[in-house]
């Protein structure tokens, strides 16, 4: 199989087989809540990417205990071994936030979630569009540029309602809904316009608009310009600069890439009391065959695979479930993933996880709890708060060993 011919995932596939759900009936979302002093939310980046602190949650195989160690991020190469493999997410963040007015005059804010073609829409969405031909001119829509979007407005958009965004530089019309997203059709190509007129969609807890610094620092240093499709950064990767990358290479630590285009759902809290009832958001992911081969070889050599962030973890563990059946080697894969990783999940690929500190009640906090145990994460977060670590996207990092069974 080649990189251009990855295995694909049916969007309706279930990706829950690695949970021991036979013994899980109820997991309270309130068990993943915690209090965080406001001053520990990092709303701006440090002057140097690798100047962040690093909390190492080291698994002690001798006594099955976990040890917390305070480090600097620049010390990361010292915590890994020659022959280990680091896997990055090479996506790039779009300037996906737009401001403007509805054609009736009301203010509106639009966040582009995903660019699509009409052929990408499901049959129900297409039926809605075509059945409203008195409102929507399909001959015109076929020539437009389509996106799935989050919309904030005082009153909900109506079918066929026009939009004027970015001081008139972008215009479009609402042609349908897909669950909580609006289907908008724009008059001009979307990506070039976003680069010119859009605003980088920094997280809502920054409580500010993006500035020139964010245009650089809310992107990774190794992003692929051709993979401009995320609405949030793979934040664990924001700590890496050329200095750290050079140290890793000098020690003989390998690097490889996957792609996951991060959606706005990454910031969404779990709203169901029983987290087992939570519906996970969908994101496009790709594991190249070359990266799969490196992972297989790394494990064959007795070395470790280090996922840089929860996005990489979700790609690797989804691909493992889809391709590495019956103890077969991991293979290249591409498709949409809705994988929800919570305690009880059995990891098949990732040996260490580098990640930031996550929001209360978030699916990402549940993921790291599954990886290093809930008790260890609770203790580590308490230590981080007492030690005044910086939290969330521009905050400090954690390096987690996989839990000791």
Curated annotation (Swiss-Prot):
UniProt keywords, alphabetically: Cytoplasm, Queuosine biosynthesis, S-adenosyl-L-methionine, Transferase
Enzyme class: transferase
EC number(s) stated in the UniProt entry for this protein: 2.4.99.17
UniProt source species: Psychrobacter cryohalolentis (strain ATCC BAA-1226 / DSM 17306 / VKM B-2378 / K5)
Pathway: tRNA modification; tRNA-queuosine biosynthesis
Assembly description: Monomer.
Protein name in the entry: S-adenosylmethionine:tRNA ribosyltransferase-isomerase
MF annotations from Gene Ontology: S-adenosylmethionine:tRNA ribosyltransferase-isomerase activity
